[in-house]
Amino acid sequence: MRIADYSVTKAVLERHGFTFKKSFGQNFLTDTNILQKIVDTAEIDDQVNVIEIGPGIGALTEFLAERAAQVMAFEIDHRLVPILVDTLRDFDNVTVVNEDILKVDLAQHIQNFKNPNLPIKVVANLPYYITTPILMHLIESGIPFCEFVVMMQKEVADRISAQPNTKAYGSLSIAVQYYMTAKVAFIVPRTVFVPAPNVDSAILKMVRRPEPAVAVEDENFFFKVSKASFTHRRKTLWNNLTGYFGKTEEVKDKLTKALDQAGLSPSVRGEALSLAEFAGLADALKGQGL
């Protein structure tokens, strides 16, 4: 029997008198086939350390611990810690950290792996309400995670992996794809969770690029420009950029020159631009002193 078997999950929750907290976005997976598929997608073996976020009662952790060198699971809900100690008692390669992943000194914790030099993968069922902040925090942390295999709301997975000229493409697509390749591995129906969420989920596989997807003079400025370009999706690049930089004649003149230098029409919409085109635009705007 597995932790994720519905009867086991139910028994564990009843034994510990656990009640779900909406504020933590708790939905526990009760399908062992999907858990197996997640671990297979992540290609976990004993030469990999794993960071898990939101382990719940240990359903995914159990599958990870069977294969990985070590698993470090960050759980914000202190009520789940004794449950995890109980359900994972047979594993000596799991460390449960009762901390908020957004506030911990992750680099320091990683030094506590027995072999901190092994590649580190992030494998997790992320809370829907805070998926994007967690992902961007980890991606921008400077810690060289080689791969993420994470479950999230399908809509968010579609946005992250979207390509130009699609409805889902936006500043989040650019922010993630600058650092990583991103592809939806498979869909997870809402029916396999306790309690069932209101939407379906997706497993997103992201692999870190050896170098960022494009070269830019100023990364922060590049992200600001891409975000500004999607402020109002139905508006043109010109309208969004003047809304961000200002509408003085001096600014308009600089914008005109930058767009011309980048080879872009003022009437194009942000959703039509590739990462390379956003890089060219950001550098041209920077060159104009904006």
Curated annotation (Swiss-Prot):
The keyword Cytoplasm applies. GO terms for cellular component: cytosol. S-adenosyl-L-methionine binds at residues 27, 29, 54, 75, 100, 125. It catalyses: adenosine(1518)/adenosine(1519) in 16S rRNA + 4 S-adenosyl-L-methionine = N(6)-dimethyladenosine(1518)/N(6)-dimethyladenosine(1519) in 16S rRNA + 4 S-adenosyl-L-homocysteine + 4 H(+). The keyword Transmembrane helix does not apply. Its main location: cytoplasm. SUPFAM superfamilies: S-adenosyl-L-methionine-dependent methyltransferases. It holds the Pfam family RrnaAD. PROSITE patterns: RRNA_A_DIMETH, SAM_RNA_A_N6_MT. It is found in: Cytoplasm. Specifically dimethylates two adjacent adenosines (A1518 and A1519) in the loop of a conserved hairpin near the 3'-end of 16S rRNA in the 30S particle. May play a critical role in biogenesis of 30S subunits. This is Ribosomal RNA small subunit methyltransferase A. The lineage of its organism: Bacteria, Bacillati, Bacillota, Bacilli, Lactobacillales.
